[in-house]
Amino acid sequence: MDFSIMVYAVIALVGVAIGWLFASYQHAQQKAEQLAEREEMVAELSAAKQQITQSEHWRAECELLNNEVRSLQSINTSLEADLREVTTRMEAAQQHADDKIRQMINSEQRLSEQFENLANRIFEHSNRRVDEQNRQSLNSLLSPLREQLDGFRRQVQDSFGKEAQERHTLTHEIRNLQQLNAQMAQEAINLTRALKGDNKTQGNWGEVVLTRVLEASGLREGYEYETQVSIENDARSRMQPDVIVRLPQGKDVVIDAKMTLVAYERYFNAEDDYTRESALQEHIASVRNHIRLLGRKDYQQLPGLRTLDYVLMFIPVEPAFLLALDRQPELITEALKNNIMLVSPTTLLVALRTIANLWRYEHQSRNAQQIADRASKLYDKMRLFIDDMSAIGQSLDKAQDNYRQAMKKLSSGRGNVLAQAEAFRGLGVEIKREINPDLAEQAVSQDEEYRLRSVPEQPNDEAYQRDDEYNQQSR
């Protein structure tokens, strides 16, 4: 019995050992499966992290593209507004020019008709008794006036022809404006990546972009704007604004280019939100620092400059400009407090095109003033001409009255010269050629008629008796 108990005990121990071994085997197998699952989860986690990194990269690229799209949409909206405004002005200017041309043509026709009527009245009134010398004198009076009218007509045609050509050129430039701005924006983005970190290169490139905007605006260097002008202030130190734009009425606008690309470049290359936000704050701080430094220069107080109350701070990179203002709109107010206006290539180009239009209208106004002055002088000349022609007409009237009086004494009335001359012929005076018989007969008849109307008197003079006898014989 003891042996059986021992056998059972051994069997029990063997069973326990086998159970323990089996349990250990299952535990080891479960642990191996857990390790495999953990490795699989680590691999999946690594793949997920890689996908998140790629997703962040693509999100940054997408945001960059969205900013570029918004920038281009803003440029397009601004250009469309500028195009509509310029088109409206062109139509108004064309209508105004057409009205002026019609007025000039009507005035010229009226003047020609008045001159023609005046000349016809003068020639008719003189009854074709004006000799060749008087006609030459009249032509000498009319020739300078005709030359002035021709010169006035040529000046008006040249002025409006030049204005039409300028309008055509402006239309052509506006059509290319969108392509130019889009190209400039793309080049600005590309160069932002190429110029990061080199402040000197960035500054030079900013001046190049500013120069291109000035050239595209239609303004002329040396006439409507000047670059790198060195001016000595009251403290004997020299200041050198990047650009000084001249305005009509003797005013100036100062433009200073500022580049801020380092923080802006790090903003787009940041791999996480914290780095991106930090770079954005540095970019805004850089713009704010440029505003303060530019405000301290106080360009408005430089001697010889009749500048406006503000300076234009030019940021050449359009997306950098929009990013700073989008996140910190208060920058505009801060700039205005320092007498500074923030401008980008698009807004500066619109402002410069407006200044170019102001200069063109100023030139047209000066031409109109010259035309008005010449018209005033022409009016004065015409008034003097009419006064002279009136004096000539009065002289002709007086000459005609004198002619009638002389002819009356010659052939009309009692005792006229022709009647007395015919009486001499009746007395036997020898003549070589008789006076016009009709005129002589009329003169004798007039003399006889006046004699019959008057109270008869006894002639005491023998000559008068012979004259009466001659008249009776003539009848």
Swiss-Prot record:
Keywords linked to the UniProt accession: Coiled coil, DNA recombination
UniProt keyword annotation of Coiled coil present: yes
Signal peptide feature range: none
Domain of life per record: Bacteria
Region listing for Disordered, in residue ranges: 440-475
Keyword Coiled coil: yes
Alphabetical list of InterPro entries matching this protein: DNA_recombination_RmuC
GO biological process: DNA recombination
Coiled coil: 25-200
Known function: Involved in DNA recombination.
Protein family: Belongs to the RmuC family.
Protein name: DNA recombination protein RmuC
Gene transcribed to yield this protein: rmuC
